[in-house]
Amino acid sequence: MRWRHTFQTRIAGVLALLLLVVVAAVYFAVKTATNRAVENQAQVQLETGSQVFERLLDLRGRRLQYGLNWLTADLPFRQAVAEGEPAAILAALRRHGTGLTSSEVFVLGLDGQVMVSTLQALTPGQAFPYNDALRQARRSGLQMLIVALDGRPFLLVQQEVVDPAPIARVAMGFPMDEVFASELRSMSNLEVSFISVQHGQPGELFSTQPEAFQASIASGLQAPYINPVAQLNLFHGQRYLSQVLPLGNTADGGEVRVLLQSPLDHALESFAPLDRQFLAIALVVLLVSLAGGGFFGTRGNAPPQSPG
């Protein structure tokens, strides 16, 4: 009968619609769970990267301090400092070989005036900009400082020159530049960017991100207020979990800001084959269910055969 055919067709349609809703709900639930898993993974990666960054800074500081202790214990260097002649001090540094390749050396008088500097931005007779911070760090037992010098971030350590009483103080600075950022990236799988801000003036940006991205990174790191909490954001069409670490412990207008970025899209790509397989299976199940519903609906509508 026609009403029976219409009823069974409606039942088949309702069942197909319900199945479609269930399949879609399961698919989007899996998709949401995948996104959350990737975000959690990125959060763990970001936290691990922050710890790696701190340990790498500590390791660099210890190495720097070891080299500085070796330098200040060198007799020819102490004699050159006692004489107070910049040329003799530089000659002793060249013979010693410490601090002339990847680090900068600052020999300071007890009054905080620069005697010798391998950084051209600081000249003899000039007051060292972080002299008070060095004194405060020494009193408080702080092993290293993170400062902004000549528009660049530096990791700074210090040691006195004694002969036998203190006659000078030597500071040695390790630049946090592209090489350091690349090393941190290789250890943490994070994108890393550094910028120094001194008295409100930003310095040069050092970043592992492509050059086309660096202008927007520098602009973001120069914001007057920095939120240190990790945030999800869209950056040049790609999703990142980002965190800004404000560094600098001198309280005299110098600050170093570090941007750590954990890419989400790259992690999501690893789940893309699983999503496609699940979607294909769901479509096959839906098509089979529709075909089965149509088949049984046709069987139910077939007229009964009369007995022979």
Description of each model-found segment:
Residues R4-L17, F278-L283, F296:
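Alpha-helical transmembrane segments and their helix-membrane boundary motifs
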Residues F154-L155, V162-F194:
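Membrane-proximal low-complexity regions enriched in glycine and acidic/polar residues
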Residues V105-G112, E191-H199:
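Short hydrophobic alpha-helical segments used for membrane anchoring or interfacial signaling
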Residues L264-G308:
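Cytoplasm-proximal transmembrane signaling helix
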Residues F7-G13, L18-E83, L100-S103, L145, ...:
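Juxtamembrane extracytoplasmic/periplasmic/luminal helical "stalk" adjacent to the first N-terminal
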Residues D150-E160, N227-V229, H236-G248, V256:
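A short beta-strand signature within small-molecule sensing/ligand-binding domains used
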